[in-house]
Swiss-Prot record:
Signal peptide: none annotated. The keyword Lyase applies. Homodimer. InterPro entries: Aldolase_TIM, OMPdecase, OMPdecase_AS, OMPdecase_bac, OMPdeCOase_dom, RibuloseP-bd_barrel. CDD domains: OMP_decarboxylase_like. GO terms for cellular component: cytosol. NCBIfam families: PRK00230.1, pyrF. Pathway: Pyrimidine metabolism; UMP biosynthesis via de novo pathway; UMP from orotate: step 2/2. The gene is pyrF. This is Orotidine 5'-phosphate decarboxylase. GO terms for biological process: 'de novo' pyrimidine nucleobase biosynthetic process; 'de novo' UMP biosynthetic process. The active site is at residue 73. Gene3D superfamilies: Aldolase class I.
Length: 246
């Protein structure tokens, strides 16, 4: 267990922050995580880091007390995705995602695969990647606005047994209205200051804006990992979250 445990969380409190560990190797990852407090954030491992390090690093981080979001965006035949979700559950993963565009049978198979676990991972559907705009959707044959496609896929994910979806903060408010208060909304594209942003997240908001819109969890990568004082950033976002909840 990471020794840097704070008294931030009570049974009624939950940090909304998920830190994206966008590193390429185990050394840099562990060097960064060493100074984090698992009560101030969850952590996310994506394709690059998982491909480079495998499950050993993931299990090590879980054993240090972190809730781990395994962000591999499964998209395959139902049996393959179901088996992958079972492996994630066996590892003790907190959250795992899959493309909702994989369809109902794939998502239902995933939900059924983990249903028997006492503590099962949250199953999250990926709707429309936050880097995509309407012109990108048109190029792949979807003549619809991103917001409409997000709602369509989110409804499908919910009715297929998933716990929530990934969506931009702009879609959070309409999804809350459509899908209720218990559906988990995981929001990337969170920046401390959206002015002058020029990275690959197109539909972005600040933490306060995203929480007010209805997001459950906020995915933050570079604003935390490249900060001079990452813990100070996490404490500030959690302070904003507490104010938003009150």
């Amino acid at each position: 267990m990471n020794p840097l445990i704070s008294d931030f969380q009570t049974p009624q409190q939950r940090t909304p922050v998920i830190v994206a560990l966008d590193f390429s190797n185990e050394k840099d990852t562990l060097g960064f995580v060493r100074n984090l407090d698992p009560t101030l954030c969850q952590i996310k491992i994506g394709k690059e880091l998982f491909t480079a390090t495998g499950r050993n690093l993931a299990e090590s981080l879980i054993n240090q007390g972190f809730k781990l979001f395994l962000d591999l965006k499964y998209h395959d035949i139902p049996h393959t995705v179901a088996q992958a979700c079972k492996v994630a559950a066996d590892m003790g993963v907190w959250m795992v995602d899959m493309h909702a565009s994989g369809g109902r049978r794939m998502m239902e198979a995933a939900a059924e695969a983990v249903a028997g676990y006492g503590t099962k991972p949250l199953l999250i559907g990926v709707t429309v990647l936050t880097s995509m705009e309407q012109s990108d959707l048109a190029e792949i044959g979807l003549n619809t606005a991103p917001e409409e496609q997000v709602i369509r896929l989110a409804k499908l994910a919910q009715s297929s047994g998933l716990d929530g979806v990934v969506c931009s903060a702009q879609e959070a408010a309409p999804l809350r209205r459509e899908l209720g208060q218990d559906f988990v909304l995981v929001t990337p594209g969170i920046r401390l200051d959206v002015a002058g942003n020029n990275d690959d997240q197109r539909r972005i908001m600040t933490p306060a804006e995203a929480l007010a819109a209805g997001s459950t969890y906020l995915v933050m990568g570079r604003p935390v990992t490249q900060a001079a004082d990452p813990v100070a950033v996490l404490r500030e976002v959690n302070r904003v979250a507490n104010l938003e909840a009150n």
